[in-house]
Amino acid sequence: MNSLLMITACLAVIGTVWAKEGYIVNYYDGCKYACLKLGENDYCLRECKARYYKSAGGYCYAFACWCTHLYEQAVVWPLPNKTCYGK
């Protein structure tokens, strides 16, 4: 019984730790949202929270906004059948 309880607790922890993350993307052209200030960034945080209401954070990584703690159905880069200006 204790083993079953421990396994259930571990699975619950793993599920909360492995939340979805990804680059915020423009639905129309498939491009990532660009940013210049790397690291913690108010612009990226604001955009992530505006697009994905339950997003816990966002920062600039590789000159694009990276959103953290997203819900599983969140749409992130790359979009299927969408290329950023043919790139």
Curated annotation (Swiss-Prot):
This is Toxin Cll3. InterPro entries: LCN-type_CS_alpha_beta_dom (IPR044062), Scorpion_toxin-like (IPR003614), Scorpion_toxin-like_sf (IPR036574), Scorpion_toxinL (IPR018218). One of its GO terms (molecular function) is toxin activity. Gene3D superfamilies: Knottin, scorpion toxin-like. Expressed by the venom gland. SMART domains: Knot1. Residues 1-19 form the signal peptide. Its main location: secreted. Beta toxins bind voltage-independently at site-4 of sodium channels (Nav) and shift the voltage of activation toward more negative potentials thereby affecting sodium channel activation and promoting spontaneous and repetitive firing. The modification Tyrosine amide is found at Y85. It comes from Centruroides limpidus (Mexican scorpion). One of its GO terms (cellular component) is extracellular region. Has the structural arrangement of an alpha-helix connected to antiparallel beta-sheets by disulfide bonds (CS-alpha/beta). It comes from the Eukaryota.
